[in-house]
């Protein structure tokens, strides 16, 4: 038993050592070779030895130059040598004369150039003046056309004010020459109730006003001239608005004076229609001025009376 354990121990140690050796060998194998051992090392050595005509290798690096230090004695001797200044000769005098001659020549040329300019200026000015004249003529024509255009536009834009119609002052009607009368009365044995009568009058555009009676005006809102009026048929013929709920009457009377404001035929038509509507609303009857039943013949008589006033 002890021998078996010893054998197993030895085999395990050998196996471990083999694994370690194999690991180190594989790691060594995977590492890159050094630059010396690489195949490109020879190429780089050859390229380093080859240089161009200026002394630079393939990488653009030149040879290393060692500069020797100059001894102090030689440097001091160079500094002690006097600097020779350039000697000036009399040759520049010719240059001065040449420059003077050039200046004189330039001065002598200026009057000629100025004269030439003066001779050329009138020609240019004449051409410019001619062009200016043409431009001015064109501008003048343009201004004339523009001014005429503006004048026509102004004439068209100016609108003559239309004369306002003269408002003729209304002539006074004077004394009444005729009165057209209509009656709206309750049926026999009945009376008109004020609480029912007032809403009907307001719906017909009557307005309570002067003399404590109702009036029908030109405007439905109750403004303008009075066309006709409505009064109580019972004396004194007035109404009391504060007591309309307790008010009762046998009937009301509608009347229109001639002459009147506006068209009398139109005014009478409005009054007749209002009387018919009021009689229907309160359940009464329509009578003429003589308190007779209204008829078509009576209507024609009223129209004849109106036309007589118009003639």
Swiss-Prot record:
> Cytoplasmic face: residue ranges?
28-311
What GO biological process terms does the UniProt entry carry, in alphabetical order? division septum assembly; FtsZ-dependent cytokinesis
Q: Name one matching Pfam family.
A: ZipA_C
**Principal subcellular localization:** membrane
**Periplasmic membrane side:** 1-6
Its placement in the membrane is given as:
Single-pass type I membrane protein
Instruction: Report one GO cellular component.
Output: plasma membrane
State the InterPro entries in the record: Cell_div_ZipA, ZipA_FtsZ-bd_C, ZipA_FtsZ-bd_C_sf
- TM annotation in the entry: 7-27
> According to the UniProt record, where is the region Disordered?
46-114
Q: Which UniProt keywords apply?
A: Cell cycle, Cell division, Cell inner membrane, Cell membrane, Membrane, Transmembrane, Transmembrane helix
Question: What's the superkingdom here?
Answer: Bacteria
Give the compositionally biased regions (Basic and acidic residues). 62-83, 94-103
Cell location: Cell inner membrane
Subunit field text? Interacts with FtsZ via their C-terminal domains.
What job does this protein perform? Essential cell division protein that stabilizes the FtsZ protofilaments by cross-linking them and that serves as a cytoplasmic membrane anchor for the Z ring. Also required for the recruitment to the septal ring of downstream cell division proteins.
The record's annotation in NCBIfam families points to: septum_zipA
Which family is annotated? Belongs to the ZipA family.
Q: What is this protein called?
A: Cell division protein ZipA
| Originating species | Shewanella woodyi (strain ATCC 51908 / MS32)
Encoding gene per record: zipA
């Amino acid at each position: 038993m002890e021998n078996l354990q010893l054998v197993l121990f030895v085999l395990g140690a050998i196996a471990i050592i083999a694994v370690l050796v194999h690991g180190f060998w594989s790691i060594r194998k995977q590492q890159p070779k050094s630059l010396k051992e690489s195949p490109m090392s020879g190429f780089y050595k050859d390229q380093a030895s080859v240089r161009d005509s200026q002394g630079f290798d393939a990488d653009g690096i030149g040879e290393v130059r060692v500069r020797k230090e100059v001894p102090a004695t030689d440097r001091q001797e160079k500094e002690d040598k006097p600097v020779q200044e350039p000697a000036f000769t009399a040759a520049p005098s010719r240059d001065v004369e040449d420059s003077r001659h050039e200046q004189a020549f330039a001065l002598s040329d200026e009057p000629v150039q100025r004269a030439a300019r003066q001779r050329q200026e009138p020609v240019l000015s004449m051409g410019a003046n001619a062009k200016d004249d043409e431009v001015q003529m064109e501008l003048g024509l343009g201004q004339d056309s523009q001014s005429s255009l503006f004048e026509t536009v102004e004439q068209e834009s100016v609108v003559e004010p239309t004369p306002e119609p003269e408002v003729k002052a209304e002539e006074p009607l004077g004394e009444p020459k005729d009165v057209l009368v209509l009656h709206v009365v309750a049926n026999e044995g009945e009376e008109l109730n004020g609480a029912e009568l007032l809403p009907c009058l307001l719906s017909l555009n009557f307005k309570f006003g002067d003399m404590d009676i109702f009036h029908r005006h030109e405007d439905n809102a109750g403004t303008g001239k009075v066309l006709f009026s409505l009064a109580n048929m019972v004396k004194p013929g007035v109404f009391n608005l504060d007591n309309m709920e307790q008010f009762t009457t046998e009937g009301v009377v509608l009347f229109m004076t001639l002459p009147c404001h506006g068209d009398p035929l139109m005014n009478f038509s409005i009054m007749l229609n209002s009387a018919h509507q009021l009689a229907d609303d309160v359940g009464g009857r329509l009578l003429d001025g003589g308190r007779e039943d209204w008829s078509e013949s009576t209507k024609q008589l009223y129209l004849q009376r109106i036309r007589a006033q118009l003639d």
